[in-house]
From Swiss-Prot:
NCBIfam families reported for this sequence: PRK00055.2-3 (NF000805)
Subunit structure: Homodimer.
Cofactor(s) named in the record: Zn(2+)
Binding site for Zn(2+) 1: 63, 65, 141, 204
Transmembrane segments: none
One Pfam assignment: Lactamase_B
Active site, UniProt feature: 67 (proton acceptor)
Protein name: Ribonuclease Z
Organism: Streptomyces avermitilis (strain ATCC 31267 / DSM 46492 / JCM 5070 / NBRC 14893 / NCIMB 12804 / NRRL 8165 / MA-4680)
Database matches in InterPro entries: Metallo-B-lactamas, RibonucZ/Hydroxyglut_hydro, RNase_Z/BN
Amino acid sequence: MSVRELVVLGTASQVPTRHRNHNGYLLRWDGEGILFDPGEGTQRQMLRAGVAAHDLHRICVTHFHGDHSLGLAGVIQRINLDRVPHEITAHYPGSGQRFFERLRYATAYRETVALTEAPVAADGVIADTPAYVLETRRLSHPVESFGYRLVEPDGRRMLPERLAAHGIKGPDVGRIQREGAIGGVSLEDVSEVRHGQRFAFVMDTRLCEGVHALAEGCDMLVIESTFLDGDHQLAEDHGHLTAGQAGRVAKDAGVRHLVLTHFSQRYSDPDAFEREARAGGFEGELTVAHDLLRVPVPKRH
């Protein structure tokens, strides 16, 4: 059975708190797991959330500030300790290669797993698989930062009433899907486009073109909202977003489910982030993330 969900491992910005771990997010996409921004303590949070090293297939790092990458050392060593049977690919800003290598080889351990380093240098497609295309866009932060966007290819949805009208049933349904036509009836005659799902992960950044490009038409957008709108100048100065800005981005992009995260420790009321995102005009499904939360990707239209 296919599962598409976000497992939230940590939601703090800069420093962990009593209730929030450093960042960490696992996207389960059918049989694959993509780990985003493993901050300090991610390995333990995986244990608490029921996420095994075997669940990981890709690691995507947006930038090399500690709250988004210090957990790499422990996660990589755990992958090797558990002898994960498949290859792991790591994506990260190429300008931070030295940081990745320091974290990968922070201490002595036995390497048992093939880990492919795939540094990112520019906007564009970084992985093209039968199940999805993974893209990056440059963001605006004091250090080089990239956001990630996963796009599922469009498919086709068979329409029972049209199949019946053309007398197509049983094994012929599978045949027309494979071959594209049967006896003058085309696949387009008995089906419609089923748009693939889209997911985006946007961390530390000011508002910029990359934010909007990543968010466009997403079924789920996971986005930082470090500050509330009253501290918008702090957000701008330090390369971050406010909850209101995140809400406006999601509204303009037609996002279906907005997930807010990466909260400054200066705020004690999580509901304030939802209020400000709503005030920004977003009317879709909205989640203020907390540690160990599971958020299903919205079902296809």
